[in-house]
Amino acid sequence: MTTTELVALLHLASPALPIGAYSYSQGLEAALDANLIRDADSARDWIASGLTDVLAHGELPFLAHQLARWQTDDTHALAAENAWFVASRESAELRRETEQMGWSLAQLCASLEWGDAARRATLASLSPIALPTAFAYAAAAHDASADATLAAYAFGWVENQTSAALKAVPLGQLAGQRIIVALRGAIDAAVRRALATPPDAVNTFAPQLGILSARHETQYSRLFRS
């Protein structure tokens, strides 16, 4: 990995990236309301399960394949699979989340003129655009490798989930850092699994997440948008 690639991926994984990730918990807040999360240990287990049972089977391999499609300018497959991913979201909240964050990242890519004009035109034509599709575009624009791209995406997801747990449980900063350290190995395993997943085996089936997310839409007290 070059220094340029590393810095670009650190930028994309940064919580300072202005795409609104901090405002979503992806069901974690609903899991807390359902008493599935009670403390640091149960928060760590919840986040680990989301990484290994959900992201590793769906979002991460989808991201890898979208990255390859951007790199080969396979615009037909890009559009078709982007639409499939948006349709696969289990609730209205989760769909709005990927659409809003995807749109925000796509606007950032266009404003910073990442990628050539032809690819930027393809990016602009994808509406709504899922976050992994936009993230794959940004990674392709910086010539990032698939394994590094997936690791950056997964780490950003773990960090955001941990941040949500710190606010909602609540947890202390040290407890949050322990969660992140504990999941480093799981991130590596999730990336390796995702890279070995063929396109027809990408699976976003997550019934518990879908149910909790739907419940969150009418939850009485909420900090987060999902």
Swiss-Prot record:
A GO cellular component term found in this entry reads: cytoplasm
Q: Which Gene3D superfamilies match?
A: Urease accessory protein UreF
Q: Where in the cell is it found?
A: Cytoplasm
Keywords, A to Z, come to: Chaperone, Cytoplasm, Nickel insertion
- Transmembrane spans: none
Gene Ontology terms for molecular function = nickel cation binding
Main location group: cytoplasm
Q: Which InterPro entries match?
A: UreF, UreF_sf
Please give the Pfam families that the UniProt record associates with this protein.
UreF (PF01730)
Q: Does the keyword NADP apply?
A: no
User: According to its UniProt entry, what is the function of this protein?
Assistant: Required for maturation of urease via the functional incorporation of the urease nickel metallocenter.
Quaternary structure note: UreD, UreF and UreG form a complex that acts as a GTP-hydrolysis-dependent molecular chaperone, activating the urease apoprotein by helping to assemble the nickel containing metallocenter of UreC. The UreE protein probably delivers the nickel.
Of which family is this protein a member?
A: Belongs to the UreF family.
Protein name, entry field: Urease accessory protein UreF
Q: Which gene encodes it?
A: ureF
